[in-house]
C-alpha cells in the first residue's frame, strides 16, 4: 500500500502533526508522526490513557478517556476514502534497569503507512518533536525510520521524515522487542526510558477519517461516475470501495451533514444511532447527533460524549473546536448531490 491515504489528491490539506506526551516528565516510546501524504478533510482528536502500577505489572486500564459521538449517520453502505492511522498507548517504563514491560503492558505502534516504531532513548526525558530534526551528536540514539531523529545528551526527539515514502508495514507483534523495531545501539545496554514509574502515560494523536455515503436503495437520485479506489488495510481488516458507484436514493433537505468518525485501532467504531434517521443518503438539518438515543455499543456513554467536527453539505462545520476543520473543497457533500471524492 502506498503511503497516501487520499491517492487522488494527496496535497489538498496541510499536515496535522501527531502529539505524544508523558505526564510529569515521563518518557515516550512508540511515538509516531502522521506522514504528510496522509491528509484529508476532517480530523478528529483522539485521546487515550493508560495507567501503570510498576515495571512488571500489566496495565490497569487502557480505554478512551471519553467516548466521542459521531456525525456519521446510520447507513449500511459506507466507503472508506481515507486510511485511518492509529497508535497504541505510549510505553512509559520504570526508571529501573532490566527488560522492557511484558507484551501485555507494552505494545508497539500499529502503523501501516509510516515507518516509525520503537525508539531508544538516552538517560533523559523524551518528547515528540515538531518535525524539526537535527543530526545525532551522541551516536547512541537511533530510530527505525532513519536519520530524522535529533539526539543529544539532554533529550531525544524522534521524528519521521514526512516526505519519505514507506512501504506497507504490518501491525507489529504485541511486544516491545520486535526485532525490526529495536534500535541498533542503546546507551548502557538498557531499552528503558528513564522516568516513568507510577506515571500516567498518554498518547494523543490526530486521525484522518473520510466516509462517503453510498446507498443500497434502488431508487436513483443521480448517477455518479467514479474511479475504483484502492483497498486500504486497517490492521487485520480490509475496507474496499466498490469499483463502481451505485445510483443514490436521496431525500430532499437543504443541508447534508456527515463525515467524521473517531476510530480506535483494530476496533469497531463507537457511535450513536438514531432510529428516526433513514439508512440511505441521510439528510440532517445541521443538528448535532451527540447526546441523542442510547448508543448501540456497550461502553459508549453519551454523557461524556463530545461532538466531533461535522462537515455539512454547504462546506461549513456544524461544530467547532481545535480538531474541527472545514473541507478545502465542498465536493464531498453538495446539497442534494453526491459527486466523486477527490
From Swiss-Prot:
Gene assigned in the entry: Krtap29-1
Keywords, alphabetical: Keratin, Repeat
Sequence similarity: Belongs to the KRTAP type 10 family.
Protein name, as recorded: Keratin-associated protein 29-1
Ranges: Sequence repeats: 5-9, 91-95, 239-243, 309-313, 324-328
Any one GO CC term of the record: keratin filament
Superkingdom as given in the UniProt entry: Eukaryota
Region (5 X 5 AA repeats of C-C-X(3)): 5-328
Protein species of origin: Mus musculus
InterPro entries: KAP (IPR002494)
